[in-house]
């Protein structure tokens, strides 16, 4: 994507303290000194990434020529961009899909028309944080200041990650959070009812050096595998992270997992998890929907009835993920149902399943071309009565190309 926008990207070279060194994990990007309407491209391809699409819509409407065609592929073209038309319309930008749909939502491919207007605007955050993050990235290029009042915000931690990254590149954005007395006492994201985002206009991005954190979403699959079936040690994670999926640690602790971090108060110390008796848990996953598949598998091995909120956030993922998870659990022989916005799962400990012979059912399963479902299925296979055969495993490369290699190493230890 950086190259498509005109940036120069060098892989395997690091520049630090005036020295050039080889580093296979490094990316060096020479930017394009973007400014309002400085970009001349007419078409942008975002692959299968909903995140990239939603972030790029505000950006290219700000720095693009005023009319840019966005294309995608595979599941992206079947997934509605919930709330995008309404939100971008509030900023004076039109989204025109190539084909008409019965839904009021828009789909890729589409054309982005117009330039983002600064000012005071109120929009809904119920569709998620990705488009809002794109606006936070784009609006510093505007001449005037912007204030966005976000009603019913979701995936709030991701907005704080965006603001943290912007700060690293010299851009000032800040927010006020709203909620009732319960929020004031709990400071729980799920109790927040609104946010007011303040973006100064006329800003410029400055080059910066960044270390990319380990990904808690990917790590969650290994943590659950260790908590249920054996032991796992993970390196490269930061327990001070703003990532929403750090919540997996709280969920595992509530379930009774044996967790520890090596090092004297070192937030980047190795994470150790090992098998322990697990009990049912209750969690609101509205702010960490990517954890839903793997914590559903976790719930199947927790004694008692677990309740996971946030099913409504799953409809427009790579699959209708709520339905896909429920179908997977039922096929495995797990008692589960969706009630309102919650998934209710009747679990049994691994020890009880082994004692009674009621392991999860193996066999042929569909991933629904969803990378997170593939990873959850592979973890579930560890507690199945026969191998689980997944129809499409290639989709896992979207977020974790080396998943099978690393997972295999852990299983063989």
Segments predicted by a language model, with ranges:
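Short, structured segments at the rim of ligand-binding sites
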Residues: 1-413
């Amino acid at each position: 994507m950086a190259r498509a926008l005109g940036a120069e990207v060098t892989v395997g070279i690091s520049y630090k303290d005036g020295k050039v060194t080889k580093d296979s994990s490094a990316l060096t990007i020479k930017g394009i000194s973007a400014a309002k309407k400085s970009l001349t491209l007419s078409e942008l391809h975002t692959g299968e990434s909903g995140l990239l699409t939603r972030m790029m819509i505000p950006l290219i409407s700000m720095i693009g020529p005023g009319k840019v065609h966005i294309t995608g592929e595979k599941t992206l073209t079947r997934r509605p961009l919930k709330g995008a038309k309404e939100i971008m319309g509030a900023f004076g930008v039109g989204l025109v899909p190539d084909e008409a749909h019965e839904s009021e939502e828009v789909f890729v491919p589409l054309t982005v028309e117009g330039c983002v207007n600064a000012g005071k605007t109120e929009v809904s955050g119920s569709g998620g944080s990705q488009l809002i993050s794109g606006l936070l990235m784009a609006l510093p290029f505007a001449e005037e200041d912007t204030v966005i009042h976000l009603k019913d915000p979701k995936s709030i931690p991701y907005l704080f990650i965006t603001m943290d990254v912007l700060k690293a590149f010299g851009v000032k954005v800040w927010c006020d959070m709203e909620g009732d007395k319960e929020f004031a006492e709990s400071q729980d994201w799920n109790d927040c009812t609104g946010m007011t985002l303040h973006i100064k206009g006329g800003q410029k991005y400055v080059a910066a050096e960044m270390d990319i954190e380990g990904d808690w979403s990917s790590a969650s699959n290994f943590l659950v595998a260790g908590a249920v079936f054996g032991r796992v040690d993970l390196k490269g994670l930061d327990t001070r992270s703003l990532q929403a999926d750090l919540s997996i640690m709280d969920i595992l602790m509530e379930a009774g997992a044996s967790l520890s971090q090596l090092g004297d108060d070192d937030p980047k110390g190795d994470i150790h998890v090992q098998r322990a008796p697990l009990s049912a848990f209750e969690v609101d996953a509205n702010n960490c929907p990517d954890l839903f598949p793997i914590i559903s598998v976790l719930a199947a091995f927790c004694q008692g009835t677990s309740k996971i909120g946030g099913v409504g956030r799953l409809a427009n993922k790579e699959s209708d993920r709520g339905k896909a998870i429920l179908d997977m659990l039922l096929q495995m022989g797990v008692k589960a149902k969706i009630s309102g916005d919650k998934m209710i799962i009747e679990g049994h400990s691994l020890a009880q399943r082994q004692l009674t012979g009621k392991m999860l059912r193996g066999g042929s399963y569909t991933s629904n071309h969803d990378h997170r479902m593939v990873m959850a299925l592979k973890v579930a296979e560890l507690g199945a009565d026969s191998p689980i055969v997944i129809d499409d495993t290639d989709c896992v490369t979207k977020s974790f190309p080396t998943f099978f290699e690393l997972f295999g190493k852990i299983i063989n230890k």
